[in-house]
Regions:
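Amphipathic interaction/junction segments at domain boundaries or subunit interfaces
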Residues: 48-54, 58-144
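N-terminal leader/assembly segments
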Residues: 1-83, 96
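Unusually extended, aromatic-enriched hydrophobic runs near protein termini
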Residues: 17, 21-24, 42, 92-112, ...
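Short, hydrophobic/π-rich interface segment
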Residues: 119-177
Length: 179
């Protein structure tokens, strides 16, 4: 899993303790085993992106206090995940007709996905998506770490930060507890 390699590298570079990665991997396998009532698409997303990060947070909590664990997760989410996603978006933004293509694909995905429930408004100049149920939030709550969901939301802000062809803002989120 790509996510596991990123986590292992982060632990090696930042924390210098591979025991954390071994525990994270154990926790991840346990969480995956206990995940129920999800579609195959949800399971794939959970296993590839969401649950490895939740397992890392839980493993960190075994080695550090909760505030320190959260700070380490914040660094991982912002500097590894968010930064890489933002870099990819800035590269894609150079593609001619980027906004047109991206908005069409994004809106199509939002209509058919089972990763979240949303309402979408759009025209040629903008699209507005209101997500009313979110797999990331549900996974954090189901795994007893709702505070971690805020970092998933923050990564969206980082992903779209500084883009010239897409403006992005979050007004309310389940992760911030104001939706």
């Amino acid at each position: 899993m790509k996510q596991q390699k990123l986590i292992q590298k982060f632990i090696k570079d930042e924390l210098l303790d591979q025991k954390i990665f071994l525990l994270q991997n154990e926790i991840l396998l346990d969480i995956i085993k206990n995940t129920k009532n999800k579609t195959p698409n949800q399971i794939k997303t959970l296993n590839n992106t969401i649950l490895p990060r939740i397992a890392l947070y839980k493993a960190l909590n075994e080695f550090y206090n909760q505030d320190e664990s959260y700070a380490i997760m914040k660094k991982y989410m912002y500097e590894v995940i968010g930064k890489n996603k933002n870099k990819s978006m800035k590269i894609m933004e150079k593609v001619p007709c980027f906004y047109f293509l991206y908005s069409k694909i994004f809106i199509h995905i939002m209509k058919i996905t089972d990763l979240q429930k949303s309402n979408t408004e759009y025209n040629k100049k903008y699209y507005n998506v209101t997500i009313t149920k979110c797999l990331w939030h549900d996974a954090c709550v189901e795994n007893w770490c709702p505070e971690l969901c805020r970092l998933f939301c923050d990564v969206d802000n980082i992903t779209y930060d500084g883009l010239k062809k897409i403006g992005f803002s979050i007004t309310k989120t389940q992760g911030y507890g104001n939706y």
